Amino acid sequence: MCETMDFFERYKNLKEKYEEKKTKPKVIVVGRSNVGKSTFVRLMTGRKDIRVGKKPGVTLKINEYDMGEYILVDMPGFGYMAGLPKKVQEKIKDEIVHYIEEHADEIAAAVQIIDTKSFFEIVERWKGRGEIPIDLEMFDFITDLKISPILVANKMDKIKKEEWDAVLDGICEYLKCQPPWHQWKFIVPAILKEGKGIEEIKKKILERVRLFKKLRGIE
């Protein structure tokens, strides 16, 4: 949650551990299925062979891409995945959690992508069942591990422009971050299918990667 995000202190405390093991930091990409993760990875890497589909669950394994200063890690989408038994979906979710826990000390940032249009409906549906909404659970999980988040509010084209601030403020409230959203530098509104927001995301990634490396003495 926002009130506990002391990422600078985490970076500083881990510097000694990285005196000998000077590996490239990782930047993970997480989100529910069908929120635009594959589109984001294509924009970041320039690779055209990354599948982008309308059916949830196109990415079913963890893929790593060397971005020069860091490794971009594309995680499978969590939640509903088309054509997969629930047992398999749960197994994939467990693998995501295990990977993040196992590599937490190597992760400079986590890019969490949400579908802004459906976010509120899905969160309320899960809460109505007495369950923790999976988007909120993932955000809490990332920040509890003191991993610096970058929350990409994708598909903003489906929101009226005059409603953007109110919608993003509402997301802040669900994340237990006091509005207005502008004060939280980790939130980036985006329309990834049009490439809008990608440069701001790249900038935030590099800021976190370079701080991460500086505090660990990684060249």
Curated annotation (Swiss-Prot):
It comes from the Archaea. The keyword Nucleotide-binding applies. One of its GO terms (molecular function) is metal ion binding. InterPro entries: G_ENGB_dom (IPR030393), GTP-bd (IPR006073), GTP-bd_ribosome_bio_YsxC (IPR019987), P-loop_NTPase (IPR027417). Keywords: Cell cycle, Cell division, GTP-binding, Magnesium, Metal-binding, Nucleotide-binding, Septation. GO terms for biological process: cell division. SUPFAM superfamilies: P-loop containing nucleoside triphosphate hydrolases. Gene3D superfamilies: P-loop containing nucleotide triphosphate hydrolases (3.40.50.300). Mg(2+) binds at residues 38, 59. Its cofactor is Mg(2+). The keyword Acetylation does not apply. GTP binds at residues 31-38, 57-61, 74-77, 154-157, 189-191. Residues 23-211 form the EngB-type G domain. Necessary for normal cell division and for the maintenance of normal septation. NCBIfam families: PRK04213.1 (NF003255). Belongs to the TRAFAC class TrmE-Era-EngA-EngB-Septin-like GTPase superfamily. EngB GTPase family. This is Probable GTP-binding protein EngB. It comes from Methanocaldococcus jannaschii (strain ATCC 43067 / DSM 2661 / JAL-1 / JCM 10045 / NBRC 100440) (Methanococcus jannaschii).
